[in-house]
Amino acid sequence: MKVSAALLCLLLIAATFSPQGLAQPDAINAPVTCCYNFTNRKISVQRLASYRRITSSKCPKEAVIFKTIVAKEICADPKQKWVQDSMDHLDKQIQTPKP
């Protein structure tokens, strides 16, 4: 009986530390971009190409990262009205096909 209990314990330990047991989904190991400071200036919508929201629990603040037409990324506070207006403008641009 002691041998079977010891064997069972050994198998459980081996299963816990096997490579498959240590494997994690790629999303867990993916790098997270966080914003620690926000821009103090309003950015003209003509300079903006796209945006993405940052809502990761690994980041200290929720944020919006705007990407400009020259590929510069700028962190902004999603609570500010100009940020919300800029996101709305970009959303409408995507929905409206260009001739």
Swiss-Prot record:
Its main location: secreted. Glycans are attached at residue 37. The modification Pyrrolidone carboxylic acid is found at residue 24. Pfam families: IL8. One of its GO terms (molecular function) is chemokine activity. Residues 1-23 form the signal peptide. SMART domains: SCY. Monomer or homodimer; in equilibrium. Is tethered on endothelial cells by glycosaminoglycan (GAG) side chains of proteoglycans. Interacts with TNFAIP6 (via Link domain). This is C-C motif chemokine 2. The lineage of its organism: Eukaryota, Metazoa, Chordata, Craniata, Vertebrata. The gene is CCL2.
